[in-house]
Design a protein with these regions (language model features):
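Repeated scaffold domains used in trafficking and secretory/extracellular systems
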Residues: 218-228, 264-273, 306-313, 352-363, ...
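Solvent-exposed alpha-helical segments and adjacent loops
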Residues: 32-181
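Sec-dependent signal peptide cleavage junction
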Residues: 20-37
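Short loop/turn segments immediately following beta-strands, especially the blade-tip
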Residues: 200-205, 250, 294-295, 332-340, ...
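Short coil/turn segments that connect the beta-strands within blades of beta-propeller domains
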Residues: 182-184, 232-234, 275-277, 316-318, ...
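Blade-loop segments of beta-propeller domains
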Residues: 209-271
Length: 464
């Protein structure tokens, strides 16, 4: 080939090489292009079948049950059963990358750092569901709130996709939060701080700072309180000191509407009877005294009852129930023309199976029943059978000696207090709460850092 032909061939090849490069410059047809490689978005789906549900080694029965319910619900709905365990680790694993990479659903407070991070800033009734790497973090400001977070996560599983042997869930955007609407209000006689306080058990603690409402009393040994209604206003009754009782408005004013310093010695219970009479039972004095709720607290009618400790008005039967040392009895009370008349219903008088009766409270949800506690047992009394029952729902967990105060909520959950000797030999600092869940009664210890409680009341103005 001649030199001229070789030059022409080289120029032709160069032109063929330049043309596609020019096209890549984006000016050939006016359409913008990119030389970056085209990639798919990252796959944020995970297989729940490979995950382990983890709860704290020392978590409450309530949280443990929430973790178990999560596993069972996933199994029932999708036929996939995740593993479940507590958070126990060997010492060297607490900060290891191996544990951080484990696919886990963390329930409540665990020893994983992701749990602490997930709960940051939560109020006592608030909850959150978040993700951190391969971790799904379910957090609550209290055990009750954690249970609400588990339920919210179960709702999010509606978007899960069942595959062969797996359950795919997209973690993208899995960020849920809310506030638990569950409330368990209690009234507490805090003898250490000389106050009646109202707190919400759902928050998990009943320290002074947790009080929704409180009133300080000038005397010691507040022995009883309850919420009632008088002349269209919600009121708080209290028995306290050596010979005192009062009724104040349940609002910010805390207005004293009635008071006496003439109860029998060591008042232990008080009750507002709808006819306008306030009854106060005193243990050492061995009397129940009946006062005009609109009066000056200086005149009364008295009925003897040895070691009288508890009172409860029964609107259905129209009687005031009372417990003394070894007896449950009832009284008809009328108030006509300024005169109080009290008559014991001897036909309702019943011997209590054990000694030293202490508390008497409504069994909300069943008007035939009442709680009765003694120095050695917790009973449910059936009015129709005239029997003290020990086989009531939850008895296996609730039954014990020396219960100073007890009550239940309309959903069946039960709260009680026993002495721990921290302040006085007869007071306790923490409450035992049993959350009703079907046939189960799931234990939660409700803590206080600064209380000394004698009685606890389900905060309900209804008599039964």
């Amino acid at each position: 080939m001649s030199l001229k032909k070789r030059i022409i061939a080289a120029l032709t090849a160069l032109a063929l090489l330049i043309l596609p490069l020019a096209a890549c410059g984006g000016k050939g047809n006016g359409t913008a292009t990119s030389d970056a490689p085209v990639t798919d978005l990252p796959d944020t789906r995970i297989d729940l079948a490979s995950y382990t549900i983890v709860r704290g080694e020392r978590s409450s029965a309530y949280v443990t049950n929430a973790a178990r319910n999560l596993r069972n619900e996933i199994k029932d709905r999708f036929g996939v059963e995740p593993a479940i365990s507590d958070d126990w680790l060997t010492e060297g694993d607490y900060t290891s990358e191996r544990v951080a990479a484990l696919p886990e659903i963390l329930i409540g407070s665990t020893n994983r750092p992701e749990s602490e991070k997930g709960a940051e800033g939560l109020g006592k009734n608030e909850w959150r569901v978040s993700t951190a790497g391969k971790k799904i973090v379910i957090s609550g400001g209290s055990d009750i709130a954690t249970g609400a977070a588990v339920n919210a996560f179960l709702g999010a599983l509606s978007g899960a996709e069942k595959t062969d042997g797996g359950l795919m869930l997209d973690l993208a955007g899995l960020a849920l939060s809310g506030t638990s609407e569950t409330r368990y209000l209690v009234g507490l006689t805090d003898q250490k701080n000389s106050t009646v306080r109202v707190c919400d058990l759902a928050g998990g603690s009943v320290s002074v700072a947790d009080s929704i409402w409180s009133r300080k009393y000038e005397y010691y040994n507040i022995a009883d309180t309850r919420l009632r209604e008088y002349n269209g206003r919600e009121v708080v009754l209290a028995a306290y000191g050596g010979n005192s009782a009062s009724m104040v408005s349940f609002d910010d004013k805390k207005e004293e509407l009635w008071r006496t310093d003439l109860t029998a010695s060591n008042p232990h219970a008080c009750e507002l009877i709808p006819c306008g009479v306030i009854a106060v039972a005193a243990s050492t004095g061995g009397e129940i005294r009946f006062f005009d709720a609109a009066g000056n607290g200086k005149t009364y009618v008295a009925e003897k009852l040895e070691d009288s400790h508890g009172l409860l008005w029964d609107p259905a039967a129209g009687v005031l129930w009372a417990v003394g040392r070894t007896v449950l009895t009832a009284y008809e009370v009328t108030f006509d023309g300024g005169k109080i008349t009290v008559t014991e219903r001897r036909d309702l008088r019943t011997a209590i199976p054990s000694d030293w009766a202490h508390d008497l409270q409504p069994y909300y949800g069943n008007t035939d029943r009442m709680w009765v506690t003694t120095g050695s047992a917790v009973y449910v009394y059936s009015k129709s059978q005239k029997k003290f029952l020990t086989d009531y729902p939850g008895a296996a967990k609730i039954q014990r000696k020396n219960v100073k105060g007890i009550g239940n909520f309309e959903d069946g959950s039960v709260v009680l207090i026993t002495p721990d000797g921290g302040f006085k030999t007869w007071t306790g600092r923490d409450l035992d709460f049993y959350a009703a869940d079907g046939g189960s009664y799931l234990y939660i210890s409700v803590k206080s850092t600064d209380g000394g409680f004698y009685k606890v009341r389900a905060w309900n103005k209804n008599y039964q």
